[in-house]
Amino acid sequence: MLRSAAITKGTQRSPNRAMLRAVGFGDEDFNKPIIGIANGYSTITPCNIGLNDLARRSEEAARQAGAMPQMFGTITVSDGISMGTEGMKYSLVSREVIADSIETACNAQSMDGVLAIGGCDKNMPGAMIALARMNIPGVFVYGGTIKPGKLADRDLTVVSAFEAVGQHASGKINEEQLTAIEKNACPGAGSCGGMFTANTMSAAIETLGLSLPYSSTMAAEDEEKANSAARSAEVLVDAIKANICPRDLLTKNAFENAISVVMAVGGSTNAVLHLLAIARSAGVDLCIDDFERIRQRVPVICDLKPSGRYVTVDLHNAGGIPQVMKQLLDAGLLHGDCRNVEGKTLRELLKDVPSEPSAEQDVIHPLSKPVYAKGHLAILKGNLASEGCVAKISGIKTPVLTGPARVFESEEACLAAILNNKVKAGDVVVIRNEGPVGGPGMREMLAPTSAIVGEDLGDKVALITDGRFSGGTYGLVVGHVAPEAAVGGMIGLVQEGDSITIDANQLLIQLNVEKDELERRSSAWEKTQPRYQTGVLGKYARMVSSASNGAVTDQP
């Protein structure tokens, strides 16, 4: 029996049916599955501006497949627009709001399945958390990647504009050049074009089996994206008939596959946070140490921005995520028996994919000639992060640095210092009180890291924070430091000039201060009043867990 029978069957449900008749149901429709279409459409960001078209295609395909689609909206926050402002504190919060809204709408109306459509960074994990919680048949449709901007012969992304700010501040480019980059960086609809957070999470979801093969790298404005959205609705109707539910697919092995693909494509640090949160909602025992274990055996084989040369449409043209997965599967680095929402195993899905990438491209490297021999997202531990932290070590020349701490209590203070040439080669920049509780909201530090790169300090300065990093960040950056400063973590005890060692080879992050002195500082530490005590941010700060657990708000 369909779950929606709770609102469509029996004489007692006559009032319920009366309401449904008002929105277009006829007598025969009460026997059809009701599908929710969670539409993240918004004109605030290019990531989501094209979602209405995909929603309409999905809606029509669902009707043709014998279902009754019911569309409802969910929110988005544009990370690129809110970046570097107080508004960025709402970004990670929006992941929880999206998850809660989808769960609420679907369960309140007893929907039989849900097709979630999203574009910007938090849309993907928010939808996946909801699907995992509800465990009703579901499919995710990614809005698609933006195509690269062009300036002369150079491919641009929005990160090019962030880096140009640092280049302008250091005198490397003039205002006219800065404006030219600004005007050409984002040419149309779609999510930020490199292997940044949105494209990383779409790749992870395709690997997990809750979106269709090849769909995670399609360009937003191409017809194949709209066709894929329509096909996704058909697949969802079949999944309802076959009772294929998210938790059937979201196994520990599936998460290990997703982590392997994130490493192989050189994905965002945010994947650690989001996959931990999705796994928790699915009841899967995934921990931060699993990422390090997998990193040690999976190389980076895609040469993608931010640290590489190419963008996601180039990856799609080179064979997409299936081509990446086929190499990993053949090498024994993936679990081939994991299934997708179509009910097919990974091994079945990849049987016709070439074992080696085409020699006519160099976006996807063969395993024998990787971009990096090991994964790029290292989990460091030490007295500065006893619960762990995430270091992105791709594109850096020196994975070991010991230097003096430059301590900042906010992103804004740090950015001002960088742009005023007060951060020098060899410094270890510490931005604290930006964690899940302390921020609150764990802002991304793209503006400071881009300014560092723009001033040609990317391989000479390290940055440590209890906040996050954008998927567009590269260099020696260490985020998600836990415990965070606001709850008494060691990062809150660092003083200006203290010696800090980051050693990616030894997986170590250490504050080089005598134990007695650290104990003295700890005893003198006092918890500060929350920056927000009411509203969404106040509520979030009271509820959110540590970054090492995914920064979730529904912990038991």
UniProtKB/Swiss-Prot annotation:
GO terms for biological process: isoleucine biosynthetic process; L-valine biosynthetic process. GO terms for molecular function: 2 iron, 2 sulfur cluster binding; dihydroxy-acid dehydratase activity; magnesium ion binding. Its EC number is 4.2.1.9. Pathway: Amino-acid biosynthesis; L-isoleucine biosynthesis; L-isoleucine from 2-oxobutanoate: step 3/4; Amino-acid biosynthesis; L-valine biosynthesis; L-valine from pyruvate: step 3/4. Binds 1 [2Fe-2S] cluster per subunit. This cluster acts as a Lewis acid cofactor. The modification N6-carboxylysine is found at residue 122. Signal peptide: none annotated. Keywords: 2Fe-2S, Amino-acid biosynthesis, Branched-chain amino acid biosynthesis, Iron, Iron-sulfur, Lyase, Magnesium, Metal-binding. It comes from the Bacteria. Its cofactor is [2Fe-2S] cluster; Mg(2+). [2Fe-2S] cluster binds at residues 47, 120, 192. Mg(2+) binds at residues 79, 121-122, 444. It holds the Pfam family ILV_EDD_C. It catalyses: (2R)-2,3-dihydroxy-3-methylbutanoate = 3-methyl-2-oxobutanoate + H2O; (2R,3R)-2,3-dihydroxy-3-methylpentanoate = (S)-3-methyl-2-oxopentanoate + H2O. The active site is at 470 (proton acceptor). Homodimer. HAMAP family: IlvD (MF_00012). Functions in the biosynthesis of branched-chain amino acids. Catalyzes the dehydration of (2R,3R)-2,3-dihydroxy-3-methylpentanoate (2,3-dihydroxy-3-methylvalerate) into 2-oxo-3-methylpentanoate (2-oxo-3-methylvalerate) and of (2R)-2,3-dihydroxy-3-methylbutanoate (2,3-dihydroxyisovalerate) into 2-oxo-3-methylbutanoate (2-oxoisovalerate), the penultimate precursor to L-isoleucine and L-valine, respectively. Belongs to the IlvD/Edd family. This is Dihydroxy-acid dehydratase.
